[in-house]
């Protein structure tokens, strides 16, 4: 779905480029129209995509980058959105997942709970804790 919508929006970006519109306007178009389609609920579905589907979405980003646009890779967009989501969950005491995010004694990194099954390891909480800790550590 995101691939199809992204391709449709790329058409309009090509039209803007062919009309020799300033690059700043094309960048703004990419950020507001195409990137917003690609980022819609990316924290939920991006990690579950097959390599083939990720390749299709990355093709849209590559095509946009060839049009002299400043683009952010899908992996970076996913990481950024997951970290933002974790920060929102930590800040909201009423959030159902708030109890899963506990800081270590240092107060900087999050504790990773014990994971007995692969099924749990592949869920949002453990992956988001790892991403958050990696972002804080670097």
Regions found by a protein language model. Give the residues of each.
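Hydrophobic/basic alpha-helical segments
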Residues: 1-138
């Amino acid at each position: 779905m995101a691939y199809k919508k992204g391709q449709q929006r790329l058409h309009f970006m090509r039209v803007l480029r062919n009309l020799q519109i300033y690059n700043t306007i094309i960048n703004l178009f990419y950020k507001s129209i195409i990137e917003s389609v690609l980022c819609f609920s990316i924290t939920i579905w991006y990690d579950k995509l097959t390599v083939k589907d990720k390749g299709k979405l990355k093709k849209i980003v590559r095509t946009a980058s060839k049009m002299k646009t400043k683009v952010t890779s899908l992996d970076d967009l996913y990481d950024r959105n997951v970290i933002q989501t974790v920060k929102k969950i930590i800040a909201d005491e009423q959030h159902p997942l708030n109890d899963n995010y506990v800081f270590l004694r240092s107060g900087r990194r999050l504790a990773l709970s014990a994971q007995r099954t692969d099924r749990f390891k592949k869920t949002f909480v453990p992956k988001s804790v790892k991403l958050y800790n990696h972002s804080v550590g670097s």
